[in-house]
Amino acid sequence: WIMGHMVNSLAQIDEFVGLGSNSIETDVSFDKQANPEYTYHGVPCDCGRSCGHSTKFNDFLKGLRKATTPGDSKYHEKLILVVFDLKTGSLYDNQAYDAGTKLAKNLLQHYWNNGNNGGRAYIILSIPKLNLYKLITGFKETLKNEGHEDLLEKVGHDFSGNDDISEVQKAYNKAGVTGHVWQSDGITNCLLRGLSRVKAAVANRDSGSGIINKVYYWTVDKRSTTRDSLDAKVDGIMTNYPDITVEILNEDAYKTKFRIATYEDNPWETFKE
C-alpha cells in the first residue's frame, strides 16, 4: 500500500493517485463539540509540503465517495484505502466516545451514502493517543445502532503515537478490538528515526499471537529509507512522493517480492510468505 501523505483537498486525491498512490492519508480536525470539522493539518508539517490545504470534512467525504465509487466520472479504481489521521488535540479525553459517534454519522451519510452504493475504499481510523480508545467504541456502536454494522467490515484501526506495542495491545483490549489492526511507526520527514520499533511491530505481526495485521512506516521520502522499509517487510509506506516508492518497487531487488495492492487484497489479513 503506497499511502499518499497529507491529502487534504479534493485536487490532491487526483494528484497523489496520479503519482502512484493506491491509498491516501487525510488529516481530520475537530471542533470543541467533537464534530469532525475540516481536513486540515496546519503548521508545522512535513518539510517541503504546504501545511495549509483545508476542506470542510463533509465536502471532502462527498468528493472521496465519488473517487471510490465505480461508475462515477471521478472514480479511481486503484484508490482502495483511506487513513483518517484524527487530529484530536482540541478534544478532552472524555469527548472520545462523542467524537467516534459523530465521525461514524458523518461517514455513514456522506461517504457510505447510508449504505446505498457509497464509496468502496477501506477506512483506517488512526488515533494519536491510547486513552482515546473510546472513540473506537463510539464509532462501532453508532454504526450498529444505525443498522449498518456490516460497514465495520470496511473499518480498521491504528494508534499513531509510537507507544510501546504492549500498551497498544491493552488499549485495543479495552476497546474490544480483536482484528483489522494496522500499526504505524514513524516521524516527520524533517527528522530521522530508526527502524527498531517497525521491526518490533513486524515481529508482532508475524508471531501469530500478536494483535497487529499490517505495519506501515511514515514519512518515507528518500530512496534509501524506502529500501530500508521494504527490507524490514512493511505492508505500507506513507510518503510525500509516491512516484519514488513506485520506482523502488520496480527495482530488481523488490519487484519479485512486492506488488502494489489491489481492491482484492484484504487489508485486514496478515500476509503469509
Swiss-Prot record:
**What does the cofactor section's free text say about binding?**
Binds 1 Mg(2+) ion per subunit.
GO cellular component term, pick one: extracellular region
Intrachain S-S bonds: C45-C51, C47-C190
Catalytic class of the enzyme: lyase
Which residues are Mg(2+)-binding?
E25, D27, D85
| Cofactor(s) annotated in UniProt | Mg(2+)
| SUPFAM superfamilies reported for this sequence | PLC-like phosphodiesterases
* InterPro entries xrefs: PLC-like_Pdiesterase_TIM-brl (IPR017946)
Recorded catalytic activity of this chain's protein: an N-(acyl)-sphingosylphosphocholine = an N-(acyl)-sphingosyl-1,3-cyclic phosphate + choline; an N-(acyl)-sphingosylphosphoethanolamine = an N-(acyl)-sphingosyl-1,3-cyclic phosphate + ethanolamine; a 1-acyl-sn-glycero-3-phosphocholine = a 1-acyl-sn-glycero-2,3-cyclic phosphate + choline; a 1-acyl-sn-glycero-3-phosphoethanolamine = a 1-acyl-sn-glycero-2,3-cyclic phosphate + ethanolamine
Q: Does the keyword Metal-binding apply?
A: yes
- Protein name according to UniProt: Dermonecrotic toxin LvSicTox-alphaIC1aii
Species of origin: Loxosceles variegata (Recluse spider)
